[in-house]
């Protein structure tokens, strides 16, 4: 028995090379020549064990997770909403921001956590597209999913229900676009910002003041202040619609952004692929201990790899973005950035090569912020005269052009050069209060720009309640019975945010919803004053874009949940038992 085992072990452990040589020698003896091809080694990867749930079990587990997360987020909705304490790293945070709460929640049960992850997705998508309305989107999604699953459990076709939901939401979005009215002046801007900041009038006033200074095409930046006061300052700057080439350049992982202060700026229309072209420049900026921002046509291959590796090792403090625009417009935009930063544009058609660039030819940016899809450059005041001269030149070109496209692009460039950046410096007595205020101001800023973009509608969930009155007409156009069920689900879900706002204010939600339904489009419930009034006139307004994105994203994720029949999650590993204390020791 032992010899058999020894033989089998030998045959298994024999190296592939020896086996190949033996086979080769046999074939050479038989035929005189052979084409040798070695078989590749094969690796087997064993996946972790999974738990699988089907049908009602999977749906109920997901629903439980969705409810837990939506309940926590829903507490913050409305002017009478509560705060939530997040105990993460360092001191606990007191927040009133839906997406921040959603991102912080991880449930211990993996199946419930899968449901919670879907609501996190709704909140994140709404935050990315509109910048606000994350709580409303989460509540809408929970309600559509809950009502939809009840119908699916009763035997309705989930695919048809999803189609009905999608068709109804698409029709409601068209109605919303017709009903939204454009922003009229600073009072509307102040009202939108105040509501989004949790009815903080001071923040609303500051946002309105900042936009008044930089205009609707300007940029608002939020920073921490060294004092207890919150102030607004306007600084020269420009926003570019290009983000970092590689996420490895990120300096602030929490926000996934690059932040530089007193950075040198290289501006060129050339493609950089060989590291030897920029090594002299990297050495000089490293000696100056200054960060380096590279704006070029592209950075690829060896150059990009070297920059990333040295950035990760802490040797270089560098980031790179692609040049904005295309063709001749790209050169014009790069010249704008060069004038803003005081750099010399390294243009290939002028024979100015990157490898010959000196420190004196680099620009200087007091602050640079780069996200995945945009870059904000705040320049030094030294280039102000040249900047004004450039703006005057662009205005002259604008007056002479007949092209609508060119006039739009020139107006955009003038706004970016002359508007500058309004910096809101946030102050607070404690770190916890500072974080909360910054989140509120961020929401207010995003909501304000969303309102300028697509107009405003009555707030407090009122617009959604009134939209529910348009559903019966949409439903009549649907022929399939299950699709009509989808329309009914949307109609019932639309009243949930208004009902929850009233509930958080201590009022019966259903009563409030019925009174809103019987009123005009702009009339609704003001939870702050506990009255029914014209919300637009009293300043309780929401951006139409926020309402639209909340509804679309909620319906999108809800449709995916309703058409889900099984969940596959990783099986939790059993925790190791605590070792017993050795005998004779006192614990």
Swiss-Prot record:
Pfam families: Cpn60_TCP1
Matching PROSITE patterns: CHAPERONINS_CPN60
GO biological process: protein refolding
Subcellular location as annotated: Plastid, Chloroplast
UniProt keyword annotation of tRNA-binding present: no
Main location: plastid
SUPFAM superfamilies on file: GroEL apical domain-like, GroEL equatorial domain-like, GroEL-intermediate domain like
Molecular function GO terms recorded: ATP binding; ATP-dependent protein folding chaperone
Transit peptide: 1-47
Keywords, ordered alphabetically: ATP-binding, Chaperone, Chloroplast, Nucleotide-binding, Plastid, Transit peptide
Residue stretches in coiled coil: none
Keyword Chloroplast belongs to the record: yes
Domain of life where this protein originates: Eukaryota
Region (Disordered): 1-33
GO CC annotations on file: chloroplast
Further facts: This protein shows ATPase activity.
Protein family according to the UniProt entry: Belongs to the chaperonin (HSP60) family.
Functional note: This protein binds RuBisCO small and large subunits and is implicated in the assembly of the enzyme oligomer.
Subunit: Oligomer of probably six alpha and six beta subunits.
This protein's name: RuBisCO large subunit-binding protein subunit alpha, chloroplastic
Source species: Pisum sativum (Garden pea)
